[in-house]
Design a protein with these regions (language model features):
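A short, acidic/glycine-rich surface segment
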Residues: 36-38, 67-71
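Vicinal oxygen chelate
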Residues: 1-2, 16-23, 27, 50-51, 53-57, 75-147
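N-terminal beta-strand motif that seeds the catalytic metal site of vicinal oxygen chelate
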Residues: 1-22, 78-85, 141-147
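Amphipathic N-proximal alpha-helical interface segments
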Residues: 56-68, 129-134
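N-terminal strand-loop-strand beta-hairpin
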Residues: 30-54
Length: 147
């Protein structure tokens, strides 16, 4: 059975200490989080993140990291970082934003699987577009974790 999901997938919050943030959000909002995960970026660097088990939309905590992409660095400050959507055509969306989007996870033939718009592209907020298949797999993983 294929998982169902909504295009509005999650809200990303940038944090200094992901373990402490998961504990704080858990105690304050009554949320439970999946274990912290790491993911490779197109630069070869990694990022650390975790999703709430309640959703969609989910709350994603992302630990600050000074990567060469400059998306999650300490200069961004803690707080609301991005909103994320499932996208059936990430390469097309990337092209539509032109120089206002950065690929963070690549796919076959260099085609983008995950992109972030730059803050100036949409009134100071970043928008993350994730390949729909990735969102469906994540949704299924989180749904299974709550069983």
């Amino acid at each position: 059975m294929e998982a169902e999901y909504v295009p509005f997938f999650h809200v990303g919050v940038l944090v200094r200490d992901i373990g402490q943030a998961a504990e704080d959000f858990g105690q304050t909002l009554g949320l439970r989080f999946e274990p912290v995960r790491s993911a490779p970026l197109v630069t070869g660097e990694t990022m650390r993140f975790c999703y709430s088990l309640a959703g969609p939309p989910y709350l994603e905590l992302v630990q600050m990291a000074a990567t060469s992409l400059g998306i999650w660095g300490p200069e961004e400050g803690e707080g609301l970082h991005h909103i994320a959507f499932a996208d059936p055509d990430v390469p097309g969306t990337c092209a539509a934003f032109g120089g206002q989007a950065d690929t963070v996870v690549g796919g076959e033939g260099g085609s983008p699987r995950v992109i972030f718009t730059r803050p100036e592209a949409l009134h100071g907020i970043r928008v993350e577009y994730l390949q729909s298949a990735m969102v469906a797999a994540t949704f299924e993983r989180l749904r299974d974790a709550t069983r």
